[in-house]
Amino acid sequence: MNLIDKIAKDKSGLFSSGKGIVTFLNPYSYLVARKNTTLYESFDSIFADGALLSAMLTLLSGRTQRISFDFTSIAQDVFEYARSHDLDVFVVGSTQENVSKSVGVFRERFPGLIISGSRDGYFDSLSRQVFIKEMVQVQPKIIIVGMGAPLQEVLLKDLKLAGWEGLGFTCGGFLHQTAKFEGDYYPSVMDKLNLRWLYRMYDEPKLIKRYVISYPIFLVYFCVDALSSKLKRLFFKS
């Protein structure tokens, strides 16, 4: 699988079926995905999370929206969709303290939103099996998972394979960001200038190493994948 060919250009039709699993790639998780192609093939939708990946894809194959799971992007749509259709949401990830604070923010921000449950993202093998079995039994309509790549993707895939039939989203660090700032994480000026990456380095200095090391590597592999995609279309077009 060539990841470039799997990334959607926009969010049209996202809620049309009411089920499926959705994830998001930034330059760092793009490298993770390249090592786990079988895992990412199982996803119904993959979006470009971040201005750099979105810009690279736009240059390669036409305008590609930046779509991420936060309040500057698709999170607002997901919660509004759930509320307007009376769909229950289960939230899993981060620490118990953070997920509880996040749920409080969601309920305050979206009055009437049905949150049927939440739990932290730390499992042992037994508790993970119990959780998956419970989700299959109760069938929450939407599950949001914030455990970091690829753990969050593996959990959603396993839920789907076990028989859960709802709509699932990975959300990366969204839960702890929401808990920390009680709502919007990015200052509006940083969002408008597409400097969210810079703000994240300021807020979480541990990410500096990731940006400095991973992003140049991403550019190399993206160019390799872009060439592969172009050659595939050239020689195997119908």
Language model features with spans:
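Short, flexible loop segments at boundaries between secondary-structure elements
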Residues: 121-124, 164-201
